[in-house]
Amino acid sequence: MFVGREKELALLRQDYIGKAVMVYGKRRVGKTTLIQKALESHHCPKVYFECLKGTLQDNIDGLVQELVRAQILPVPLQFTALQDVFAYLNTLPQKMVVVVDEYPYLKAMNESATVDSIFQSIIDNRIANIALIISGSHIGMMRETLQEKNALYGRFAATIKLNELSYLDA
């Protein structure tokens, strides 16, 4: 049974095709479970990718593997830029949901401002057929993306901060 997150679940179940959503909060508060539950109601291809503590290329390769596993890509294709992955996905006829979880891992292992700038470009130009959900646990790093000086400022159609459930809600 899924309890205590009805408001957040309803928000995530909305149609965000062509938009980006951010979900953040402390570790172990239910971000991934909430996202997975919301994805059950989306009747389109979906892919869940947990960022690696590695290079951009490691993460590109990992995302491509998940796209193949989700049968969005028929075979692994070679990409050297995240923007190219999303540009390719944007040419596909079907709408889809792409979840990028543990986004701070990507920022911690690569130039943080560059990663945000890459995702700014993706959100602005390469998700017409995609609902993009970015999630993470490093609250400071996730909040940083919401600040006016950040490349991702104003780019999220919805921002969901998950707090721990109270005893009564759980």
Identify what each model region corresponds to.
Residues M1-A170:
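Phosphate-binding site recognition
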